[in-house]
Amino acid sequence: MYGHTREQFEEHLFSAGELTFALYYGTFGELAGFAFNGVQCVTHGKSRMAAFSGGGFFRPGYNGCGVVAMFFGLRQALRFKFRQPGTALGYLARTSSPVAYCLFTRTMPRVYPCRTCATPAEVDNLVRSIGEGRHYVRTNADSWVVRSDAIPRDASRMSKHDDHPDVRFYSRINPRFCEGDALLVWIPLNAANIFGGLYRQVRLRVFRWSQ
């Protein structure tokens, strides 16, 4: 959200409705950033389900923030499943860079769109419906590419990841991410995906601590 006023930032953040926040602090007690999470109940066909939204904003210089924010989101999803076990749940996000997309593919067992499998028609229709409900603005014929206020500040820093297969996949679908286009990502939050994601999160955090 570099270059936005406080009012623009608040409008972007609270457009998702009521949110839950987690604050994170640095070694000396300074505020490092925060993660947030919201839920939107929708009806798709004859089924009712819940669609999570969320993300995080952290000051430059702090490492592993994306993993921390995702861990918070998965814990919130798990709490929701315990409270409403009969309600289907998923997470829809706008990824504004290939690195953000790769964070999802690295930490979650099932993510759409995926370079190794086709997106089922029912998932495509569901994402289209939720995106319209959130008033996402499509920027081309692909319904998975929408407008975003979160534009990478310095895309050149991501060039070291250009050879990664998921980066190439993302860049092929959304080549204009430096100009404000974002790729939607849908993550089914069933029990297998939630626990698989938590396992990968713990493994990544242990790996970071051991370095």
Show the residue positions of the predicted features.
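Hydrophobic, proline/glycine-rich low-complexity stretches
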Residues: M1-E7
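Terminal substrate-recognition subdomain of acyl/acetyltransferases
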Residues: Q8-G26, L31-A32, K81-Q211
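Conserved beta-strand in the GNAT
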Residues: L23, G29-Q40, F52, F57
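Feature marks short, surface-exposed loop/turn motifs that line or immediately flank catalytic pockets
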Residues: C41, R59-P60, V99
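A short, polar/charged loop-to-alpha-helix boundary motif
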Residues: C41-M49
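Conserved acetyl-CoA binding element of GNAT-fold acetyltransferases
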Residues: R48-P60, G73, A93-R94
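Conserved acetyl-CoA-binding loop-helix of GNAT-fold acetyltransferases
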Residues: F58, N63-R79
